[in-house]
Amino acid sequence: LVPLTIEEAYELIEAILRGEDAEIVEELGDVLLHVFFYARMGEEEGRFSIDTVVERLNQKLIARHPHVYGQAQASDAKAVLAQWEKLKAAQSERSVIGGLPERLPPLLKAYRLQEKAAAVGFDWASLQGLTEKLKEELAELQRAIEANQLSEAAAELGDVLFVLVNLGRHLGIDPERALHQTNQKFEKRFQYIEKRLKEAQKTFAECDLEELDAYWQQSKSLYP
């Protein structure tokens, strides 16, 4: 059932990114069905029930939202998140950045690691420092490439990606959504090239890069 649950979760994410309410409703229902499946399986095995799940959720929400259910103060969403992460760390005795699923997509995991660290004050003070760090990492990547040190280049590329995710977080840009939009744009532009080649009864192998680039430039005006 787990692979199907992962599939349903991704289908929900895609529906959310497309902004299609009817799809979102349907996919939320599918995910909810899986929640009930697991709860039912737990009940049949005498381990837990849906009531246990809901009760634990209630306890966690109350414990980690003292600004709502207690006397604590939180002025904005950032303060709420910081409070949440501190309480999680205190209650679980885990690392502040612990608790993230091992199978979480790397881009999302990078974002959440940085978000958790920032919640306890370990963060860049300004965008300027972050952009300077990006320049530094790009220079290190360039040196590794020029030296033909592929393993070092791989490590430096990872550093660049990590900084880019952090930059997106500071700008309030979801890197997953940003990359998703760029992927969609590339797909549309590339499919335009395929369409033009089909109309001309030609293949990619029969075209030089200059001709393909001309089609690409045309596609950019259609799909900016």
Question: What is the predicted function of each stretch?
Answer:
Residues 1-27, 33-157, 161-224:
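Flexible "arm" and connector segments at domain edges
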